[in-house]
Design a protein with these regions (language model features):
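Non-catalytic C-terminal interaction segments of nucleic acid-processing enzymes
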Residues: 1-41, 139, 192-302
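Conserved catalytic cores of phosphodiester-cleaving nucleases, focusing on short active-site segments
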Residues: 69, 73, 117-177
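A short acidic, glycine-rich active-site loop
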Residues: 173-189
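Interdomain/boundary linker segments immediately adjacent to catalytic/signaling cores
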Residues: 1-110
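A structural signal for short, well-ordered beta-strand segments and their strand-loop junctions
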Residues: 82-85, 150-152, 205-210
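Soluble or luminal CAZymes and related metallo-dependent hydrolases
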Residues: 61-65, 185-190
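Catalytic micro-motifs at enzyme active sites that drive phosphoryl/nucleotidyl and oxygen chemistry
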Residues: 103-111, 135-141, 194-197
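Short catalytic/ligand-binding loop motif for oxyanion handling, primarily in non-cytosolic enzymes
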Residues: 91-92, 129, 158-162, 214-220
Length: 302
């Protein structure tokens, strides 16, 4: 397995004029169409003041998905790599002491250097900590430049295989259906901060969508290419789960099946009590075993 192609970022950079044109044609705001360099400072940053059950459940889902994917690489017999946590893993919730300071620090880092992905994959034998999140941004980014790829991990409450099987049967039965497959979801506003990270670190990146039965992934280059070519392989929607923000939707079948769960996760209930006495209960996925598709991972590396 070789280190990523040195012209990876250059190839994405060449797509940007067409990306901007496509997004502008779809009515995306000008502020989301400025790629490269540090972003402008926001005049006012709204800081979350309270974390409720839905936020806590979503964070628990994300933590589980990231852990399941990391474990699949560590237990793979066909791929020898090192893997490290790299993205922001702040355990503080809105309203807790220290949250405001950490939130503002993370926003400023992202503005200057881009949004860092959750995991980094390194060639076997690379001497690297298993968790880079405690390092300074500069130190962590130095390690990122040695990586094969970064992986942004997304979670879903669906079983992808079951979803697609039901939709196929609906089509046979001529039942109306709006979407035949789940989608990779990328907020339009995230494109420029993903691009900024690529610009700073010059390491390729993937998006991985972890379901309760499988995991699918796509290279970020392909995401930019779909947008640049205005391909029919993507749409822009404003789903409620994304706070009605413009979101790029690409069918997971346009990517690669990165893994399948041989053991399904279980679920536990966790409870958090706020300082004012409000009790929030939420579900946390636990365990499960994701078996990595080694050939799919190799295909995803450009």
């Amino acid at each position: 397995m070789s280190i990523h192609s040195p012209d990876y970022f250059t190839r994405i950079k060449e797509l940007i004029p067409a990306v901007i044109q496509t997004l502008a044609n779809k009515g995306i705001e000008e502020k989301h169409l400025q790629f490269g360099g540090e972003a402008e400072k926001e005049p006012k940053i709204s800081i979350p003041t309270d974390a409720r059950s839905e936020f806590l459940a979503n964070r628990a889902m994300g933590d589980w998905a990231e852990g399941a994917l990391k474990e699949s690489f560590m237990s793979s017999n066909g791929i020898a790599v090192e893997i490290s946590h790299y993205g922001d893993t702040d355990s503080l919730a809105a309203g807790e002491p220290g949250f405001k300071e950490n939130y503002l620090r993370a926003k400023e880092e992202t503005r200057r250097w881009g949004k860092r992905p959750d995991l980094l994959i390194f060639p076997a034998g690379t001497v690297v900590p298993s968790d880079l999140t405690a390092l300074s941004r500069e130190e962590a980014d130095d390690f990122a430049r040695l990586a094969l790829a970064g992986i942004e991990v997304r979670s879903s409450k669906f079983k992808a295989d079951k979803y697609m099987a039901v939709k196929r049967q609906d089509k046979i039965d001529k039942k109306p259906s709006s979407r035949e497959t789940p989608s990779f979801t990328v907020k339009v506003e995230d494109l420029k901060i993903v691009y900024r990270w690529l610009e700073v670190v010059q390491t390729q990146q993937m998006y991985a969508q972890v379901f309760f039965d499988s995991c699918f992934a796509i290279n970020v280059y392909a995401i930019f290419e779909y947008v640049a070519t205005a391909s029919k392989g993507f749409t822009i929607e404003k789903p409620e789960k994304s706070q009605n923000k413009a979101t790029i939707m690409i069918p997971i079948t346009n990517g690669e099946r990165l893994g399948t769960f041989s053991v399904s996760p279980e679920f536990g209930v966790e409870v958090r009590e706020t300082r004012t006495g409000r009790v929030d209960a939420y579900v946390r996925p636990q365990g499960g075993q994701l078996v990595l598709e080694e050939e799919a991972f190799k295909k995803l590396l450009l």
